């Protein structure tokens, strides 16, 4: 005969898990829109992380400098441009001279 044990139902929010699709061992459960159940083992997911395909970006990514492609100008050049802009600002002289 099999023996079973009971455990209390969690009462507070702090006792509930953050994600209902994972287990403490790292197994991930998912379903497709058609209802197919997919089980990903932790070991398999860690192996996929190091595969060459995972390190290759998708082909249709938009070109966003600094996000999907390297920045167009190094930060030092951007800082130089900001310094030039501050030097070219109009001085704070009185706009109108008034005789009192």
Curated annotation (Swiss-Prot):
Annotated protein name in UniProt: Eukaryotic translation initiation factor 4E-binding protein 3
Main subcellular localisation: cytoplasm
InterPro entries from the UniProt entry: EIF4EBP
Keyword Ligase tagged: no
Species of the source: Homo sapiens (Human)
Gene name of the record: EIF4EBP3
UniProt region (Disordered), positions on chain: 81-100
GO molecular function: eukaryotic initiation factor 4E binding; translation repressor activity
Reported modifications of this chain: Phosphorylated.
UniProt xrefs under Pfam families: eIF_4EBP (PF05456)
UniProtKB keywords: Cytoplasm, Nucleus, Phosphoprotein, Protein synthesis inhibitor, Translation regulation
Domain of life per record: Eukaryota
One GO process term, biological-process aspect: negative regulation of translational initiation
Record-stated family: Belongs to the eIF4E-binding protein family.
